[in-house]
Amino acid sequence: MSAEVLEQPVLGSRRLSNYLVAAAVSIGGIGFLLASLSSYLGRDLLPLGHPAALIFVPQGLVMGLYSIAAALLATYLWYVIAVDVGGGSNRFDKAAGVVTVSRRGFRKPVLVEIPLKDVKAVKVEVRDGFNARRRVALRIQGRRDMPLTRVGEPLPLAQLEQDGAELARFLGVNLEGL
């Protein structure tokens, strides 16, 4: 961090949990495909169980449809991971007087530029419960709050407070929400 520019990377969809889900869906889809083919061919293609004993219509056919659904879902998940949807950065440039929030989207990048003079405060939002939310956002004059933290897994409270305080100190604005 220099005295004039602060850049914060934002983690997108390249998280361990997304890799594990995509791998599980892929393996499950292959299992359903092999079970369906075993049922159709009358030979066991899977080392576990005896899918050749299944009647192709309707059981083997339905497993084939499950394998198609799993292949489509796995393709989507691997694409989201490859593109790193949601990843990007927050750049605060005092010299240029601008905040730049950039994220990677499905088809094109999302780029939002906000003049520093419009930033009124840094807001730390903590909501616990079933749908927990922990985020740092910019309070902007005449606009809705601009979230700065990643989507998904909530940040630890200590890190959230530290990030909010560091950003408020850098921008010279108040810290709200604690």
From Swiss-Prot:
One annotated Gene Ontology cellular component of this protein: plasma membrane-derived thylakoid membrane
NCBIfam families membership: PRK02542.1
Function noted in UniProt: Seems to be required for the assembly of the photosystem I complex.
Subcellular location: Cellular thylakoid membrane
Broad class of the protein's primary localization: membrane
Keywords: Membrane, Photosynthesis, Thylakoid, Transmembrane, Transmembrane helix
Domain of life, source organism: Bacteria
Membrane topology designation: Multi-pass membrane protein
Designated gene of the protein: ycf4
Family: Belongs to the Ycf4 family.
Residue ranges of the TM segments: 19-41, 61-83
GO biological process, one term: photosynthesis
Protein name in the entry: Photosystem I assembly protein Ycf4
Species this protein is from: Parasynechococcus marenigrum (strain WH8102)
